[in-house]
């Protein structure tokens, strides 16, 4: 459901007593297969037809991600676009009183295009300025923070890097390949790295 009213960071200040926070992610590939009625077994035990079905399932998961409802949607891209518009973009704007949703959307698109490399907040601000969107670096930082707190993107950092490098050029990935896919025209390598990052975050 909507996260505009409460995010996980608000629980401690809203609920009294003891509580346990459990993060829920989109399906892993194993969960996706189970929900699709496909059983994962050792590759050498699969028939040719079963291998073909498994490859088809992975192709769908790789491109459209693991949101449960997307499994039954004929227009998966339309569903994911609507999900982004209604839940993520709408919730971020409502929760954080973002008056210019266009600038936020373009910033998120730039995050999608940068998913394979560390981002520079200054560079994003300059890129947006070049297309007529005048926002400061502090606003870009806030927008990225809003997207992270709303579970649209997740941040992974190089623990071996120096502190200044960690903070100034972090790497961000989308919480699901399906959400990343709607922003990209040539998505293959970006989707692959994003899928690995999601698996790392979900199981770390």
Spans of features found by a protein language model:
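Short gly/ser-rich loop at a beta-strand->alpha-helix junction or flexible surface loop bordering the NTP-binding
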Residues: 1-2, 7, 197-199
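Residues that form or immediately flank small-molecule/cofactor binding pockets and catalytic motifs
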Residues: 2, 26-29, 158-160, 177
